[in-house]
């Protein structure tokens, strides 16, 4: 298995990154020292909101982490309602309007309440892979079949 890293995120004077080797790091941006590390297997870009870090593992678990301590606040299995769970992989996610919008390799878009971790909706967008969702001018978009699609 080759190494896959998440995008690097700079926030709160820290650098955050993770990989598919069970390593999620918070690094002090000034000194380069590791503030904390967690065993999370993810190659998706984390999202930081104030002192909370949201990330989704390659196995489909949503993690919420306390930025200052590195302690895991909550873990939610976002694939628990999918029968073909082992074949599905998270593609990317965004946090907007107190919800996590997670795109999956089976063409589904999962909506999760970020406060409770409860899955609110699953929308089948396509029968194949879709991109990570994007927000522009208060509208959500993703790429499917090599075309840009607006999600209502």
Predicted features, each with a name:
Residues 92-111:
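C-terminal hydrophobic structural anchor segments
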Residues 25-26, 63, 110-111, 149-150:
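WD40 beta-propeller blade core
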Residues 21, 59, 106, 145-146:
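Surface-exposed loop/turn positions within WD40 beta-propeller blades
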């Amino acid at each position: 298995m080759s190494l896959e890293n998440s995008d690097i995120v700079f926030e709160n004077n820290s650098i955050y990154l993770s990989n598919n080797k069970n390593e999620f790091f918070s690094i002090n941006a000034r000194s380069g020292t590791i503030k904390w590390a967690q065993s999370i297997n993810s190659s998706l870009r984390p999202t930081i909101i104030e002192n909370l870090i949201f990330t989704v593992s390659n196995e489909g678990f949503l993690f919420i982490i306390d930025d200052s301590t590195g302690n895991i606040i909550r873990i939610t299995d976002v694939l628990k309602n999918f029968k073909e769970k082992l074949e599905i992989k998270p593609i990317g996610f965004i946090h907007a309007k107190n919800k996590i919008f997670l795109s999956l390799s089976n063409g589904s878009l999962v909506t999760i309440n970020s406060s409770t971790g409860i899955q609110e909706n699953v929308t089948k967008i396509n029968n194949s892979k879709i991109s990570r969702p994007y927000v522009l001018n208060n509208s959500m978009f993703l790429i499917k079949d090599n075309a840009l699609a607006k999600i209502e």
